[in-house]
């Protein structure tokens, strides 16, 4: 399978209605980047913009819309939907939207499709941050260029502009 590029992905997203489920660590910078590129972005979250704090204020000022409240998933719509890492593709609402023609993806999925270099992933219940940090440092010490990201605090998709 041929790798996509970030530029190709952004070109394909132009003119689409983009929905991001949740305003978590990975979606904040993605929403900001997409808004900066002039895309129509809506965040769907259970929490109100006030509860979401400064990130919501900044994104609102950039033209990002918010749909919030207990029924946010029932209101969910879009041409391209970025699911939160904790929401599986087989969620009933996502299945409905896919059946209606929506593309459902995630920040991590797009990163995996576009990343031009080897990827090391760490999963599990306990110790992921420590293990990931140790692996990254060992690779750095051996002379490798390392791009550390994920739930460690940096959205991986945004790092694609620095990876070759």
What is the meaning of each model-derived region?
Residues 74-76, 85-164:
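Phosphate-binding loop of NTP-binding sites
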Residues 1-106, 110:
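N-terminal leader/targeting and accessory segments in enzymes
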